């Protein structure tokens, strides 16, 4: 089949969209927006987009043939048939205003994802934590089984070198975003819920019951013959299960899970465990990821794959050979310092539960190492709403370098900034954190902090990920390096 024939076949899956030729993305540099744009470029659409800065996502889209504008302007949308907008974009953005004046349809990211999913076998992964890893594991499993899925993920799948890919099969595996409740646009065949915690509460008016009900509604978007795969270990998920009127498969470490993990052991970056499934043989598995939280993510993938009759051999191989996701406990190398060798790991987790899971994985895999964390809080509202939880979890490391809050466009909130959080942790009495007012100062502080054998963990959803890579490239700012193993 030629490339043109493949485009025509894929385009025919959504025949009404053949009237649409030019699609413009406002905020195209985000992982979610860029992933959908990449799929559409490869389907043969003329894709353009704008963002305030160039990044790896925009660079990749340029190479694929998309037209990228750095900066927003009314002229960018003049030729568009439809405009896709990120939730981070202000309604007063000149491109949004121009699209309205020109009567160009404006859709949210999740609406476009829903159109891609409409005539495919959709697998949607939702939950407060673990979405990206679970989506990546499912995509890897289906790929290993020869199913060649389309996928859209919120992080870089290392084995593919991208966060999105257009496959040739009917499968679409995608992360479902609850942050703005837009995941309610999706109508998949299989839905996964990893866990439910209080986050993005501004979307839900501060009402946790509303958040829980929204997850129930998400699961009821499944057809009556669809499947809900849910983590029974999560107390809130277990609580809402009686309200779910769809076929359910549960997973977890709990004795009553349909897909259960047993005999968990962690050694360094890898975990071993046995999976028990109803009506199937037990499997002894090696997972090339650290931590019990990642075993839960793997169980979700196993449950989805088993339900779709994917062979056990593909499950075994995909989990053992999984190459990880960018910024999810990503090992960036080992570096020499004047006081000895230090290991550098970078992680995206920015909710207290995510930080706790990362710390637990680090302690389990490297129990003899001193844990030094450089943490950058993400959003003033999250810091305010989960302030006491942050104090508790950040007090669990051996040494804390606390950066100022990454605002993500929010206005500062008194008492919810990095300096206040640092002071509160110090008053707790377990730790004497070091406040880092500017990210540029981190490299200056490290020589006085790091000791031989330390595990340096950079943590957060802001620009600390880029900072961590700068540190790796400069060998933590020291002139001599030990064996450096920077991984993609």
Swiss-Prot record:
Instruction: Please give the superkingdom of this protein's source.
Output: Bacteria
The organism named in the record is Shewanella sp. (strain MR-4)
Q: Name one GO molecular function term.
A: UDP-N-acetylmuramate-L-alanine ligase activity
The EC number(s) given in the record are 6.3.2.8
What pathway is it annotated to?
A: Cell wall biogenesis; peptidoglycan biosynthesis
Q: What is this protein's record name?
A: UDP-N-acetylmuramate--L-alanine ligase
The family assignment reads: Belongs to the MurCDEF family.
GO biological process per UniProt:
cell division; cell wall organization; peptidoglycan biosynthetic process; regulation of cell shape
Q: Which UniProt keywords apply?
A: ATP-binding, Cell cycle, Cell division, Cell shape, Cell wall biogenesis/degradation, Cytoplasm, Ligase, Nucleotide-binding, Peptidoglycan synthesis
What reaction gets catalysed by this protein?
Answer: UDP-N-acetyl-alpha-D-muramate + L-alanine + ATP = UDP-N-acetyl-alpha-D-muramoyl-L-alanine + ADP + phosphate + H(+)
Checking Gene3D superfamilies in the record gives: Mur ligase, C-terminal domain (3.90.190.20), Mur-like, catalytic domain (3.40.1190.10), NAD(P)-binding Rossmann-like Domain (3.40.50.720)
> Which positions in this protein are listed as binding ATP?
127-133
Q: Which GO terms describe its cellular component?
A: cytoplasm
**Which Pfam families does the UniProt record give?**
Mur_ligase, Mur_ligase_C, Mur_ligase_M
Q: Which InterPro entries match?
A: Mur-like_cat_sf (IPR036565), Mur_ligase_C (IPR004101), Mur_ligase_C_dom_sf (IPR036615), Mur_ligase_cen (IPR013221), Mur_ligase_N (IPR000713), MurCDEF_pg_biosynth (IPR050061), UDP-N-AcMur_Ala_ligase_MurC (IPR005758)
Please state where this protein is localized.
Answer: Cytoplasm
Function (record text): Cell wall formation.
């Amino acid at each position: 089949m030629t490339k043109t024939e493949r485009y025509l076949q894929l385009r025919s899956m959504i025949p009404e969209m053949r009237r649409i030729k030019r699609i413009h993305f406002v905020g195209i540099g985000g992982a979610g927006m860029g992933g959908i744009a990449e799929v559409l470029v490869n389907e043969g659409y003329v894709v353009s987009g704008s963002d305030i800065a160039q990044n790896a996502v925009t660079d990749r889209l340029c190479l694929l043939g998309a037209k990228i504008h750095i900066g927003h302007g009314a002229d960018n949308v003049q030729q568009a048939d439809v405009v896709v907008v990120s939730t981070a974009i202000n309604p007063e953005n000149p491109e949004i205003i121009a699209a309205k004046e020109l009567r160009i349809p404006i859709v949210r990211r999740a609406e476009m994802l829903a159109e891609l999913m409409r005539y495919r076998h959709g697998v949607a992964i939702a939950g407060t934590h673990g979405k990206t890893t679970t989506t990546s594991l499912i995509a890897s499993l289906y790929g290993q089984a020869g199913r060649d899925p389309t996928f859209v993920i919120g992080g870089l799948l290392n084995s593919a070198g991208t966060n999105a890919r257009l496959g040739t099969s009917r499968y679409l595996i995608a992360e479902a975003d609850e942050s703005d409740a837009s995941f309610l646009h999706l109508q998949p065949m299989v839905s996964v819920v990893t866990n439910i915690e209080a986050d993005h509460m501004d979307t839900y008016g501060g009402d946790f019951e509303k958040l829980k009900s929204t997850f129930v509604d998400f699961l009821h978007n499944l057809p009556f013959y669809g499947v809900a795969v849910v983590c029974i270990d999560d107390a809130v998920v277990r609580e809402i299960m009686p309200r779910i009127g769809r076929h359910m498969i549960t997973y977890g470490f709990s004795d009553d899970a349909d897909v259960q993990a047993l005999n968990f052991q962690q050694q360094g970056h890898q975990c071993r465990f046995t999976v028990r499934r109803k009506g199937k043989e037990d499997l002894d598995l090696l997972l090339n990821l650290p931590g019990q939280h990642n075993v839960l993510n793997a169980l979700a993938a196993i449950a989805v794959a088993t339900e779709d009759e994917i062979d056990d051999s593909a499950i075994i191989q995909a989990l053992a050979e999984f190459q990880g996701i960018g910024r999810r406990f990503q090992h960036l190398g080992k570096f020499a310092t004047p006081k000895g060798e230090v290991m550098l790991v970078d992680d995206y987790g920015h909710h207290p539960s995510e930080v706790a899971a990362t710390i637990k994985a680090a302690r389990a895999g490297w129990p003899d190492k001193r844990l030094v964390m450089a943490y950058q809080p993400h959003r003033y509202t999250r810091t305010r709403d989960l302030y006491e939880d942050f104090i508790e979890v950040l007090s669990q490391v051996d040494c804390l370098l606390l950066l100022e809050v990454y605002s993500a466009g929010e206005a500062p909130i008194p008492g919810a900034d990095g300096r206040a959080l640092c002071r509160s942790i110090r008053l707790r009495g377990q730790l004497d954190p070091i406040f880092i007012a500017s990210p540029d100062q981190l490299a200056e502080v490290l020589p006085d902090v790091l000791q031989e054998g330390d595990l340096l963990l950079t943590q957060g959803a802001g620009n600390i990920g880029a900072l961590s890579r700068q540190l790796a490239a400069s060998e933590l700012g020291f002139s001599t390096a030990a064996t450096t193993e920077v991984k993609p």
